[in-house]
Amino acid sequence: MVSTFSRKDQNYKNDDLNQPSIEGRFGKYGGQYVPETLMPALFELEDAASNAWKDKLFVEELNHLLKTYVGRETPLYEAKRLTEHYKNKQATPRIWLKREDLNHTGAHKINNALGQALLAIRMGKKRIIAETGAGQHGVATATVCARFGLKCIIYMGAEDIKRQSLNVFRMKLLGAEVKVVNSGTATLKDATSEAIRDWVSNVETTHYILGSVAGPHPFPKIVRDFHAVIGEETKKQCLESFGSLPDILLACVGGGSNAMGLFHPFVKETSVRLIGVEAAGSGVDTDKHAATITKGSVGILHGSMSLLLQDDNGQVQEAHSISAGLDYPGVGPEHSHLKDIGRAEYGSVTDQEALDALKLVSELEGIIPALETAHAFAWLDKLCPTLEKDTNIVINCSGRGDKDVNTVASSLDI
């Protein structure tokens, strides 16, 4: 397990937080590095999102669907057996789970897919494209397209299709066309590249529902804002459950959408530690990992400047994780900024550590988390021994593990 954080890094002002600049940057990260043909679509999307949040009817419709279709609000659950497991002489880490796995479709992804589908309808776009790695964003996008009668095309890497056959079937059952991407490593990065190529060619009729807080502005802000309901509910539920804000928020980070959704309402609450956990794969000292913040450097990928896994010549390197949803060589620009100014901490755990955590949580709490989520649970082994007082820790349980059972069964020899 590796951590990037030092308390000496905390040199930010609250003015640095929460909103991108007019150029779409968080600090030096973000921006719009795209073909000219996409710029009108990005401007249109930015205006549509800005106007939608000011429209009372849009907000009411979104909230109504989040409640009646998605199943929000999701519970804040006290994991008492996990708490007992990590209790030590110095402190009791009281562990709470924000149950995004209980959303319709089984993960946090539908918060953003639903919101962007409503934006697409406002813009008159009837054709939807999306990329997916673990398949959860693809399923969420296919779901909302079925709900609103929109044509849906999902790009997915051939390698991820092998790992996530259940979600591929779900997407097809929901009426989506799943396009196999064989280029590159045939994973999430390549699926995203193909989706962007499609968008360039069909920008007049098509909206791209990007699935993470990555890509060109305004996507990082739009995706974050639709997921901020996670953190907003968590803040209210913590006050109801134990009478204060949490001490620590913990979430896995690939592109970083579930983490930003949890973190965003708390970034100005400086008493709350924000911890993101990346995929160390076979180890960060090998060439098989996806620990972008831990080991990356500044570069440009998929229309945005952020931290990337790249070689000395600026060529993007392959990422590796047992978790298809974390198998990405970049990260959202806001995460890079929060790391730089010391507001958030980032660590990484290996495939094996994530598998061990998944097994532990399943046995102690009767909850099978997604492999992505298991990376956040694995960080408890590193975090809890360092605590010097009783601490309320909220983990974003970003998805359920049904999709991963074949991978887990073969890896754990069950």
From Swiss-Prot:
Swiss-Prot/TrEMBL catalytic activity: (1S,2R)-1-C-(indol-3-yl)glycerol 3-phosphate + L-serine = D-glyceraldehyde 3-phosphate + L-tryptophan + H2O
Pathway(s) served: Amino-acid biosynthesis; L-tryptophan biosynthesis; L-tryptophan from chorismate: step 5/5
KW Lyase (keyword) present: yes
Molecular-function GO term, any one: tryptophan synthase activity
Keywords (A to Z) from UniProt: Amino-acid biosynthesis, Aromatic amino acid biosynthesis, Lyase, Pyridoxal phosphate, Tryptophan biosynthesis
Pfam hit, one: PALP
One cellular-component annotation, GO: cytoplasm
This protein's record includes keyword Aminoacyl-tRNA synthetase: no
Family: Belongs to the TrpB family.
Summary of subunit composition and partner proteins: Tetramer of two alpha and two beta chains.
HAMAP family: Trp_synth_beta
Function: The beta subunit is responsible for the synthesis of L-tryptophan from indole and L-serine.
Name assigned to this protein: Tryptophan synthase beta chain
